[in-house]
A protein has these predicted regions:
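Beta-strand elements of well-folded, non-transmembrane domains
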Residues: 10-12, 57-61, 72, 87, ...
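Hydrophobic ligand-binding cavity/cleft-lining segments
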Residues: 1-48
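Hydrophobic pocket/interface hotspot
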Residues: 17-21, 27, 53-55, 70, ...
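Short, surface-exposed coil-to-beta transition loops
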Residues: 3-5, 63-67, 89-93
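A short, structured loop/turn motif at beta-sheet edges
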Residues: 14, 46-47, 71-78, 96-105
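Glycine-rich portal/gate segments that line the openings of hydrophobic small-molecule binding cavities
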Residues: 38-85
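Beta-strand/loop substructures that line and gate deep hydrophobic ligand-binding cavities in soluble
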Residues: 82-125
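Short beta-strand micro-motifs in enzyme catalytic cores
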Residues: 2, 51-53, 104
């Protein structure tokens, strides 16, 4: 299993940033530019524990459906999404919100097993 993480300090109230992440209208704002995410369907707005997210992920040569579930929500602290079906053998993504002087530290942590066995390792950053 692999783990990637990245933190960013944002001059914003922790509760406000947490609510921003749960608002489904903001998914395109918080998604990276690659891979391209489209055909997004979410079961609720705002997201809550048990909400589902269905989307299409476009890589250079192919598209793939990805089904996620919001598996845990800790008020103003954590949003966890877990892959139900998609490109990875295993995928758990945590958005962690921590109050710091002057704002909020948001940390993204992803634990995953790449697809395609050893060939999947070629796709790692």
């Amino acid at each position: 299993m692999f783990k990637l993480g990245k933190s960013v300090d944002i001059k914003c109230d922790r509760e406000e940033l947490f609510r921003f992440h749960l608002n489904t209208n903001n998914i395109t704002v918080i998604s990276p530019p690659f891979p391209v995410v489209s055909d997004i369907k979410m079961s609720s707005n705002p997201l809550a524990k048990g909400s589902t997210v269905d989307l299409t992920v476009s890589f250079i040569l192919f598209k793939m459906k990805w089904f996620l579930e919001v598996s845990e929500v800790l008020e103003n602290s954590l949003v966890r999404d877990t892959q139900l079906r998609g490109p990875f053998k295993y995928w758990v993504h945590d958005h962690i919100f921590e109050e710091i002087p002057g704002g909020t530290r948001m940390t993204d942590e992803v634990r995953f097993i790449p697809p395609f066995g050893i060939l999947g390792l070629l796709a790692l950053p």
